[in-house]
A protein has these predicted regions:
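Long, amphipathic alpha-helical surface segments
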Residues: 2-16, 23-26, 30-43, 80-84, ...
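Extracellular/periplasmic catalytic domains that process cell-envelope and extracellular macromolecules
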Residues: 19-20, 47-50, 102-106
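Residue-level detector of buried hydrophobic side-chain packing
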Residues: 28, 56, 110-111, 166
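Active-site-proximal beta-strand/loop segments in catalytic clefts of secreted hydrolases
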Residues: 31-32, 58-59, 113-115
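Substrate-binding/active-site groove segments that recognize
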Residues: 45-71
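Alpha-helical segment that forms one wall of the substrate-binding/catalytic cleft
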Residues: 66-99, 104-122, 133
């Protein structure tokens, strides 16, 4: 089992990385499994479908400050440390593109979404445009639906579940990450 992500965050960290919360970390970890376990707490690098970049753990492109090679391996502790660094970086990048105040649930959902699709896709997606323009709940659900319903080549059902969890978290007013609730999304919209 990988290390717990619940670390004490200072007030300075909360201000510096507003989207990086325990909730966002939990949301990503709940739906992302570290890939290519070698056993005994070691993990190997891998390539995602259609990519030329090597990754490790939760999708990190680097380990210990350098880009990965095909022969790289890492321990649980190294993967966890790099995952936290990646999320801090993503938090800063997401903060640059979101111009409206958001609840902690919404921040968590957006960080998970951006981490999954990549910052280049996130900054140009229509969903971000709707969020920044204070669009209605129905408009957001309608825009999130293709991300839920699309057949993901490398993610399959796990990716569909992750997108639903992100939407549920984004729409949830509570402090807990909600369990899945069905939305009126057409299954084969795209």
């Amino acid at each position: 089992m990988l290390l717990s992500h619940k670390k004490v965050r200072t007030r300075e960290d909360k201000l510096k990385y507003p989207f990086f919360t325990e909730k966002s970390t939990e949301l990503i970890k709940r739906s992302t499994v570290p890939r290519t376990s070698l056993g005994m707490g070691r993990y190997a690098s891998y390539k995602d479908y259609g990519e030329s970049i090597w990754r490790i753990g939760y999708g990190s492109k680097q380990i210990s400050g350098r880009y990965l090679l095909s022969t790289d391996k890492a321990t649980e502790e190294e993967i966890e440390k790099q995952f936290i660094e990646d999320l801090k970086e993503f938090s800063n990048l997401v903060k640059e593109y979101v111009f409206v105040p958001l609840s902690s649930n919404r921040k968590a959902a957006l960080l998970s979404f951006a981490h999954s699709i990549g910052i280049q896709s996130f900054k140009t997606c229509r969903l971000l445009e709707l969020i920044n323009s204070h669009s209605s709940k129905n408009a957001l659900i309608k825009e999130w639906s293709p991300y839920i319903n699309r057949i993901w080549q490398s993610g399959g059902d796990l990716m569909v579940t992750k997108r639903r969890m992100e939407l549920d978290t984004y729409l949830s007013p509570s402090k807990e990450i909600p369990t899945f609730t069905p939305h009126r999304c057409r299954r084969n919209a795209y």
